[in-house]
Amino acid sequence: MVSELVSMYVPPIVEAAKAVTPWQAAAGVTAAIFIGSYLWHSASLRKQRRTGTADGGLFSLTAGGIKKQDVTKLVDSFSQAYKTEDDGQLTCHHITREQSVEMVNTFYDLITDLYEWAWDTSFHFSCRPRWANFAQAQVLHEWRIANLANIQPGMKVLDVGTGVGNPGRTIASLSGAQVTGVTINAYQVKRALHHTRKAKLEDFYKPVQADFTDTPFEDDTFDAAFAIEATCHAPKLEQVYKEVYRVLKPGAYFALYDGVTKPNFDPKNERHVQLMNATVIGNGCPDMRTWKECEEIGKEVGFKLHMSYDAGEASRVLHPWWEKLDNFINTGFAWYGPASIKLLSKIGFLPRDFTKFIDIAAASVFSVKEAGELGIFTPMYVFVWQKPEKTA
């Protein structure tokens, strides 16, 4: 199945490469080898790569906390974690919860530096106002979820699936709240600490390595919680909802954006299923849920639903959330970005079989964009939950 998904999208990369003239290719390869070799042999860069304190960029890419010799085995195990169900949809339902957690952890080891290089330190989409740039749109997107969670100065707030922490730092800075972010991935904690120290926000934001379905916090600890495109990585959604419910104080709000299929998704439409399969594996999700399933699970856990809607369709004057993916494709970055990484793998700057993972991730650029245009998927369906007040 993985090879089929890759074959759908990789041929255009090959065709684009054929259009490059020999002298352009030779110049590019020579420059890349020279620069790559110079930077690779720089002691300071090697130290930064090892400690997770590099400031991003193509030559700061690593495989996270994975040892170079283990990359091949873990990339293969990541791909093999997925199987096709009877309805044609790709899931990890056949593996144990522990294996699913490990699969997601491996995904973040492999993808974190790529996200920081190609995207930014906020690992999410946003709809851009006409007057704003991408960075401003990201902040606005984060601030909306903070408002929906009713975050106030001095509150203790949980960031559920913090990544490298930029949304948590933004919300802490703007609200005056104390934000604790949890991520399953040790390398992301390193990166979050690096960015937090650099921003001098240690007193406002703290990253913690923990499984968001089994956190180390006491019952009724937090005044609010938020999640941005994170709970779609939970092996079972009810597990993370139950845990957030447990650690929230009575009356507290939990607001989140989640990746879900929309009413237009037709499980009998072969193209729809292909797009969702590429989206699932390309983003390290155990499966793809519908917005209705998310609503039902939250209610079963005990939350009160205050609102749910697709933020991607909230305003007609905003640029679509897949705009940056469109830019990647139109500018050629979706082709020359992966090609550059493959070159670095070829010369030994990155683990050789890291390229297998790049093919999977690159395919999702095209699938996610098309799914957005078809109106069958959104990464920003809003759910605003409240833990009921205790009754006397």
Swiss-Prot record:
<dbReference type="GO" id="GO:0032259">
    <property type="term" value="P:methylation"/>
</dbReference>
<keyword id="KW-0489">Methyltransferase</keyword>
<keyword id="KW-0443">Lipid metabolism</keyword>
<dbReference type="Pfam" id="PF08498">
    <property type="entry name" value="Sterol_MT_C"/>
</dbReference>
<dbReference type="GO" id="GO:0016126">
    <property type="term" value="P:sterol biosynthetic process"/>
</dbReference>
<dbReference type="Pfam" id="PF08241">
    <property type="entry name" value="Methyltransf_11"/>
</dbReference>
<dbReference type="GO" id="GO:0005783">
    <property type="term" value="C:endoplasmic reticulum"/>
</dbReference>
<dbReference type="InterPro" id="IPR050447">
    <property type="entry name" value="Erg6_SMT_methyltransf"/>
</dbReference>
<keyword id="KW-0472">Membrane</keyword>
<dbReference type="InterPro" id="IPR013216">
    <property type="entry name" value="Methyltransf_11"/>
</dbReference>
<dbReference type="InterPro" id="IPR030384">
    <property type="entry name" value="MeTrfase_SMT"/>
</dbReference>
<keyword id="KW-0812">Transmembrane</keyword>
<dbReference type="GO" id="GO:0016020">
    <property type="term" value="C:membrane"/>
</dbReference>
<keyword id="KW-0808">Transferase</keyword>
<dbReference type="InterPro" id="IPR029063">
    <property type="entry name" value="SAM-dependent_MTases_sf"/>
</dbReference>
<dbReference type="GO" id="GO:0003838">
    <property type="term" value="F:sterol 24-C-methyltransferase activity"/>
</dbReference>
<keyword id="KW-0444">Lipid biosynthesis</keyword>
<comment type="function">
    <text>Unable to convert squalene, botryococcene, cycloartenol, zymosterol or lanosterol to mono-, di-, tri- or tetramethylated derivatives.</text>
</comment>
<keyword id="KW-0949">S-adenosyl-L-methionine</keyword>
<comment type="similarity">
    <text>Belongs to the class I-like SAM-binding methyltransferase superfamily. Erg6/SMT family.</text>
</comment>
<protein>
    <recommendedName>
        <fullName>Sterol methyltransferase-like 3</fullName>
        <ecNumber>2.1.1.-</ecNumber>
    </recommendedName>
</protein>
<keyword id="KW-0256">Endoplasmic reticulum</keyword>
<dbReference type="InterPro" id="IPR013705">
    <property type="entry name" value="Sterol_MeTrfase_C"/>
</dbReference>
<keyword id="KW-1133">Transmembrane helix</keyword>
<feature type="transmembrane region" description="Helical">
    <location>
        <begin position="20"/>
        <end position="42"/>
    </location>
</feature>
<keyword id="KW-0492">Microsome</keyword>
